[in-house]
């Protein structure tokens, strides 16, 4: 006979989405997080490039990111052993053909992004001397962009979950999900878990979890993004370089532990799986970076890939499934789940528990409607 475990809330998935929402729910409910893998955060969280940028993503994403900064800058006592954010800065470069676009982006985002400014070719050459002048005639510089210690943040949420009385179970292979009178029953072979509220934070697998629960899918589309580390050019101090991308988001590179991290910014549709980097992705990334810089990248020291999961409109999803007040989506985090996690987790925790959104989230422009999965039916 299966052992039955009771909780007020079951969260499926212990990546950044599940860990953050569980952390914020734990003071108000008995929370149980179920993770299929041996370790939490394997497929997306642990493979992130880890940049905090208030100019990245849609208006919804930018609002969530701004709201998250307060937590990252001043986390609760004991949450982290060292700062979550480290100064980095970010610059999007463009050619003469991008001058109008850069100024338009600045006009759109400067009112809500402190210090955002347009920089010229001379500034770019002085700051990142490997940039080719013809490729970097103008830039949009965000001084407040920062590196995120993803592991410290993720583990902080998981430590805090446990400290607040919540539980994390790993190596849980869910076989079935059934709705009974007033409860969900999650069967994992020799164990069963029961709770009146189910949160689906299973990343690229959220539609598969929904199918087990007989809930209409949201049309999640996992996309592969590849990255690589390579040696910095000899004789040049790259430690203080900003994160560098182009206004078309065709590549990026940034300092990373004495090396440089590069990426072709690819978004290739794939089925959910333990994704691996494609050689072509890496070659494209190297080519694009070499096109705009004087760097020669001979052989990456490491390559990897991660999954970024989207719905049709590209925005994050957080809300009850239509017609199901006991099944809550925390999904479609795309490439924004790390930098929005504190705000997304707190927002979804309050919405799922029927609590009002705190004032600081409302002040940032966060609403239930902007996350509601019902928008996908329109």
Spans of features found by a protein language model:
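C-terminal lid/capping helical subdomain adjacent to the catalytic/cofactor pocket in oxidative enzymes
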Residues: 3-7, 323-378
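Dinucleotide-binding Rossmann-like beta1-alpha1 core, especially the glycine-rich loop
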Residues: 49-127, 250-251, 288
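Flavin (FAD/FMN) cofactor-binding and adjacent substrate-gating region
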Residues: 74, 93-164, 169-170, 176-182, ...
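Central helical "cap/lid" subdomain
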Residues: 41, 192-240
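Core beta-strand elements of the Rossmann-like FAD/NAD(P) dinucleotide-binding domain
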Residues: 4-7, 188-197
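Glycine-rich FAD pyrophosphate-binding loop
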Residues: 26-45
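N-terminal Rossmann-like FAD-binding beta1-loop-alpha1 element of flavoenzymes
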Residues: 7-32
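Active-site lid/adjacent beta-loop-alpha segment flanking the redox-cofactor pocket in flavoenzymes
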Residues: 216-219, 232-326, 331
């Amino acid at each position: 006979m299966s052992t039955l475990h009771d909780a007020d809330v079951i969260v499926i998935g212990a990546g950044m989405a599940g860990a953050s929402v569980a952390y914020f729910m734990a003071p108000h409910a008995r929370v149980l997080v179920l993770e299929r893998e041996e370790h939490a955060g394997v497929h997306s969280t642990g493979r992130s490039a880890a940049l905090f940028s208030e100019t990245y993503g849609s208006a919804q994403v930018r609002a969530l990111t701004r709201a998250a900064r307060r937590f990252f800058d001043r986390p609760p006592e004991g949450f982290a052993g060292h700062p979550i954010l480290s100064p980095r800065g970010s610059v999007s470069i463009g050619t003469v053909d991008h001058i109008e676009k850069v100024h338009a982006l600045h006009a759109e985002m400067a009112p809500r992004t402190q210090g955002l400014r347009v920089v010229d070719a001379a500034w770019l050459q002085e700051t990142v001397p490997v940039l080719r002048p013809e490729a970097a005639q103008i830039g949009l510089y965000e001084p407040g962009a920062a590196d995120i210690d993803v592991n410290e943040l993720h583990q902080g949420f998981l430590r805090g979950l446990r400290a607040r009385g919540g539980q994390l179970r790993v190596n849980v292979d869910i076989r079935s999900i059934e709705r009974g009178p007033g409860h969900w029953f999650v069967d994992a072979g020799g164990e069963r878990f029961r709770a009146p509220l189910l949160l689906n934070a299973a990343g690229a697998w959220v539609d598969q979890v929904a199918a087990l629960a007989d809930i209409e899918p949201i049309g999640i589309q996992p996309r592969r993004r590849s990255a690589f580390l390579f040696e910095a050019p000899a004789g040049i101090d790259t430690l203080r370089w900003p994160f560098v991308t182009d206004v078309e988001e065709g590549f990026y590179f940034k300092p990373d532990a004495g090396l440089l991290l590069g990426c072709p910014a690819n978004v290739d549709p794939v089925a959910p799986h333990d994704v691996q980097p494609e050689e072509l992705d890496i070659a494209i990334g190297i080519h694009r970076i070499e096109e705009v810089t004087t760097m020669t990248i001979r052989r990456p020291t490491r390559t990897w890939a991660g999954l970024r999961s989207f719905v049709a409109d590209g925005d994050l999803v957080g809300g009850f499934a239509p017609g199901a007040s006991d099944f809550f989506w925390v999904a479609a985090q795309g490439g924004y789940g790390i930098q929005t996690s504190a705000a997304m987790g707190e927002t979804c925790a309050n919405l799922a528990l029927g609590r009002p959104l705190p004032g600081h989230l409302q002040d940032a422009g966060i609403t239930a409607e902007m996350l509601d999965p019902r928008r996908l039916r329109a």
